[in-house]
């Protein structure tokens, strides 16, 4: 009887230890929650113009994931979902010449494209936007769409572009004409204006040109003046 009790106690202890180990393993397999946060705003100088001699104030703040610096950002983030958001990227570029003998790099601020941030996984990725020019293009977000005026690689064409997250090609790319080639940022056209019900976006690169597109899923159609007048009279 005594031997039987000892055997049962031993089996019980083994079962308890096994259960604890299984629980610990399962707990370790669970994904750890990530903390995504922004730092404080700071002012930086962004030099523009033909000789890059005109300083503009650039509001910058750091993006941290689990207290680790990931990127520098500017502007207000846009929440795509309760999990994903996008924000404009800025970065520091080494402006030191090969002939300059200095131990410390000469850093200058530059504006980049857009970042996609996942609050759950903590992943930060750069978004590839066709014809997006970091100097001239101003992105206007609505849901998972972004509208902007893009510039061709040779600088001779200005495009109305609508892109959607998760799609490699834009759902809209239409030539608006030629860029003015101004030396100031965001000077080619203002941020496009969105509206809902129905979903539409309006581009107005100058006072003489205004064009509206209707967006339905992955399809985009131009909206003529007659349609706008009819809806305005309802």
Where in the sequence are the language-model features?
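Exposed acidic/polar residues on beta-strands and adjacent loops within beta-sheet cores, strongest
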Residues: 28-234
């Amino acid at each position: 009887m005594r031997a039987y009790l000892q055997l049962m106690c031993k089996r019980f202890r083994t079962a308890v230890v096994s259960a604890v180990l299984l629980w610990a393993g399962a707990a370790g397999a669970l994904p750890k929650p990530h903390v995504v946060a922004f730092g404080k705003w700071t002012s930086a100088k962004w030099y523009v113009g033909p000789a890059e001699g005109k300083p503009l104030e650039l509001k910058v703040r750091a993006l941290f994931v689990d207290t680790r610096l990931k990127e520098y950002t500017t502007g207000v983030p846009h929440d795509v979902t309760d999990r994903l958001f996008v924000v404009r990227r800025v970065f520091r570029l080494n402006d030191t010449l090969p002939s300059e003998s200095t131990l410390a790099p000469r850093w200058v601020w530059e504006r980049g494209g857009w970042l996609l941030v996942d609050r759950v996984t903590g992943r930060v990725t750069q978004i590839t936007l066709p014809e997006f020019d970091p100097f001239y293009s101003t992105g206007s977000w609505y849901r998972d769409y972004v509208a902007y005026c893009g510039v061709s690689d040779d600088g001779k064409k200005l495009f109305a572009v609508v892109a959607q997250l998760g799609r490699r090609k834009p759902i809209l790319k239409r030539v608006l004409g030629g860029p003015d080639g101004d030396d100031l940022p965001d000077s080619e056209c203002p941020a496009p204006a969105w509206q809902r019900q129905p979903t539409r976006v309006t581009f107005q690169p100058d006072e003489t040109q205004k064009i509206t597109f209707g967006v339905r899923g992955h399809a985009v159609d131009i909206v003529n003046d007659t349609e706008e007048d009819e809806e305005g009279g309802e």
